[in-house]
Amino acid sequence: MRKEGLHVLKISKRWTTKGISFLLTCFILLCPFSAFAEEPTTDYSTQSWLEAFGSLHSRISAEYAFTEWKGVDWDALGNACRAKIEQAQASDDFNAYYVALRQYGNAIPDGHVRVSNLPQVDDLYVGGGFGFSPALLSDGNVIACWVDETSDAYRAGMRAGDALIRWNGEPFTQAAQQARVEFATNSATEENAAMKRVQYIARAPVGTAATVVFEHPNDNGIYTANLTAYADQGITLQKNYPDAVVPDPIRAMILNIPYNGPKADTMVAFRLLEGNIAYIRVLGELDIDLTDTGSAPSTLAAFRAAVQQAVDANAAALILDIRNNVGGLDDMTAAMLGSFYTQKTLFEYQNVYDSATGTRSVSATEDSAGTLYIEPVEPCYTGRVIALINQKCLSCGEGLAMGIRNLENGDTLGFYGTNGSFGLAGAEATMPGGFTVSWPSGQSLGADRQIQLDSRNGVGGVAPTLRIPMTAENALKTAQGEDVELAAALAELQTKP
């Protein structure tokens, strides 16, 4: 939740899951990790579904930060959703109302626009899998990167590495255009959207029948399997990138979505890798009590301690792993980057929305409260740095990626670029049914006072300066839990320190 001024954030929220309590010293609830302009949550929960949507649409269409930038047609979106909710209300169909709102939010290509999930309803639509995980390759082809050996797909002869040719009679990528991606988080870039469509075409209601045509790479034989979706606890998504490789415990617990991966006990982790290369993982730019002590340790202090360890070890290079980084505070992000900069450098101008006037403004003065700089600090690491990034590196995590990319000694590496969502989040609305809708109302501006990082026409975020292709080989390795990106970063640094 990117924020214009750390001193403003005094809100705390305790999360408890399986005996672990999270004390969040900044606001993160449902407003995906961007700047929070202090505006109260608007409660529409006592209104009818149709009235609540009208209230929501009136507000979000006025406040959303990137209407012109992204070309959002609010009239078309509003009319389409209103018709669905009218029908849902007439038939008292709560699920149809919820799905209509999810489709409404998902139509906006922004990772900061979010309709909170109701997992029990989501599972009615995408709770079933077909026994294999489809992976989109860099060349546009699709393979099964993993196959459940107990599934009908496996019994029909499908194996990991097989090319997926057709789905229900259509070319696979064409069929993927119909995937129920409204139950996933929003995609700000086409790169991210295309990957999600392919992954979610193999999700459906339990009991759904489907036909898949696939090809073995070794004999070029074409095979057909008739499959039925079964409850699989979402394993086909877990076996794909990034879930198969990169843990995501903070996001899962914040968003209240199922998660079976490794838990986290610290926001920052440090270790020395082969060749005396330092590795620092940062899960987010915020303070969280992950060990239920009753207080949240300083993530910034932990980060600076990790950099100090790298300096003390005279590390030959440093890998900053910000894949799946959930974001956090602008102030903390700029402060972290100070450990790599030797000169004061602009981080951003904040073009903040004022709900009283309905306008945005950024101060004309260089040292205003809405202007953030990267201030050099000690310890400072000046060796080569590679930031590992992916499409779940969101908001302030993207600010870290941008800062590393802009260093002469810095690179970004990954299969994909970052999320492309760097706006300043505004208020949220509580809707009938207990879920919320949130959106960004402010903009992050670069030195030219133009919008930075937020996607436009399907392109945005921080791209890898060292891009790793998603080949069939890499997709198969990823499904087995092998960290191809980290290995590539190590190889790069060992050959070009």
PLM regions: where:
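C-terminal "exit" segments of structured domains
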Residues: 425-451
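A recognition module on extended beta-rich or small alphabeta surfaces enriched in W/G with H and D/E
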Residues: 171, 180, 187-189, 451-466
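Low-complexity, Gly/Ser/Thr/Pro-rich intrinsically disordered linker/tail segments
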Residues: 454, 458-497
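Gram-positive cell-envelope targeting signals
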Residues: 1-38
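Short Pro/Gly-enriched beta-strand edge/turn motifs at strand-loop
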Residues: 114-116, 192-196, 250
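Cleft-lining beta-strand/loop regions that shape enzyme active-site pockets
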Residues: 208-209, 213-429
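PDZ domains, with a preference for the canonical peptide-binding region formed by the helix
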Residues: 89-93, 163-213, 332-334, 420-423, ...
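Terminal targeting/pro-maturation regions of precursor/exported proteins
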Residues: 36-166, 171-173, 201-220, 224-237, ...
